[in-house]
């Protein structure tokens, strides 16, 4: 999150970073803290879909409407993103291809190939109902 904030500092955006463990309830607590700020956010970008669902659940408890009052996005595009209401905007990660690539590298390492390399996999945004300006 720190590198992303540094990258967009020149855009004069008002960004606030909030850390949470991989827990919907802790994400809900982080969401509640963000809603106490003088300048409330218009969008919450969560590092994974589980945290985003925790934020949506907390918004509901606080009578904050998603997406009318705030947009919430996740990252992963796991099944829960299509089950939660409203459906969750997210970034699709090709988990199957990621696993295949990792297994292939492990097999090469086991065979003595120490030429570790970085593998880039394409992701894409999945626009859903949790965005205020959902197409």
Descriptions of predicted regions:
Residues 1-135:
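Bacterial carbohydrate/catabolite-sensing allosteric modules
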